[in-house]
Amino acid sequence: MAIQRGAKVRVLRKESYWYRDVGTVAAVDTSGILYPVIVRFDKINYYNINTNNFREDELEVVEEPKPKAKASS
């Protein structure tokens, strides 16, 4: 199953500052780029950055995104 926007994911890339940390998927690019998943973290790194791009195989889904409530009419 593909990773969706809003999912909580754990980073499995060992050289990453956020290795084994949990972040939220901000966006998923479907154009075919090498690192299509943008993940946002609560913790900032040494350069005051809190987002990074990852491949899907470098991430482990911890919690699926909550379904949006349908608007009542």
From Swiss-Prot:
The keyword Repeat does not apply. GO terms for biological process: photosynthesis. It is a peripheral membrane protein. The keyword Signal does not apply. InterPro entries: Elect_transpt_acc-like_dom_sf, PSI_PsaE. Keywords: Membrane, Photosynthesis, Photosystem I, Thylakoid. Pfam families: PSI_PsaE (PF02427). Its main location: membrane. It is found in: Cellular thylakoid membrane. It comes from the Bacteria. One of its GO terms (cellular component) is photosystem I reaction center. Belongs to the PsaE family. HAMAP family: PSI_PsaE. Stabilizes the interaction between PsaC and the PSI core, assists the docking of the ferredoxin to PSI and interacts with ferredoxin-NADP oxidoreductase. This is Photosystem I reaction center subunit IV. It comes from Synechococcus sp. (strain JA-3-3Ab) (Cyanobacteria bacterium Yellowstone A-Prime). The gene is psaE.
